[in-house]
Swiss-Prot record:
Involved in Mg(2+) ion dislocation from EF-Tu: region residues: 80-83
PANTHER family: ELONGATION FACTOR TS, ELONGATION FACTOR TS, MITOCHONDRIAL
Record protein name field: Elongation factor Ts
Biological classification of the source: Bacteria, Pseudomonadati, Pseudomonadota, Betaproteobacteria, Burkholderiales
KW tRNA-binding (keyword) present: no
NCBIfam families: tsf
HAMAP family: EF_Ts (MF_00050)
Disulfide bonds: none
Gene this chain is encoded by: tsf
Keyword presence, Protein biosynthesis: yes
GO cellular component, one term: cytoplasm
The species this protein was found in: Methylibium petroleiphilum (strain ATCC BAA-1232 / LMG 22953 / PM1)
Amino acid sequence: MPAITASMVAELRAKTDAPMMECKKALTEAEGDLNKAEELLRVKLGSKASKAASRVTAEGIVVAHISGTTGALMELNCETDFVSKNDDFLAFGKTLAELVATKAPVDVAALSALEIAGVTVEATRTALIGKIGENIAIRRFKRFSGDSKLVSYLHGTRIGVVVEYTGDDVAAKDVAMHVAAMKPVALTSADVPADLIEKERNVAAGKAAEDAKAAEAAGKAPQSAEIVTKRVEGSVQKFLKEVSLFNQTFVKNDKQTVEQMLKAASTTIKGFTMYIVGEGIEKKTDDFAAEVAAQVAAAKGQ
């Protein structure tokens, strides 16, 4: 078998983008045959991707791409915070956001079929999984286009906001920053989803019921049904004010609401979208004690 030289390893790495040690192992296994080593690596990287596919991806990045009145916001997930800072992972996310903005895929499947430098997004993702050793998932994206101006704000790589607006650019940027900080769920109270309102109403009613039980236990008269109804409705209205953008106190000036700030700046917000990394994904937690106990039990044949 010919000696495995540094130049052979470098050439294989350039072709496959695999780690140096993986390239050396493949060349050794292929007895110096570069083509065979490349084939072995392709299989190995694909195998790594298959094994990683079932693992939870609750970390990652949010990326925005804005070009005039066209833009995109997307979330790319991985398994650990460490990988979310990897240069290749970050570059992949940036490229995907640009693809969404320029090619307008309708869903993740359509995005995965697009090409990056002659290679499909899916093949690129699979190769990156093999290189990094973690599952990588394109979770979601939204494309923006139309007559409205666009502005984005990124809080690191974990929170991303895109605001659609007409009017003052500085005011719109401030709103994007405000959204990231205060996390409204809708523009106005009327836009808040009915299920969130119902949930808040149930919570308020539950608190009132607990107070009634406590009053009875203390030998006091509980609040009347009329007072309870007003109390519940008051809680709901307070909630609506807290979660609707226009009603929120402006984060940079607590003397005015966002709506008042926008009016003074002659600016209209048409909509906003916010992504938070891992939002709604149940993260896996490792129970070390339980794992050790299971291993001991297995060793005892239990």
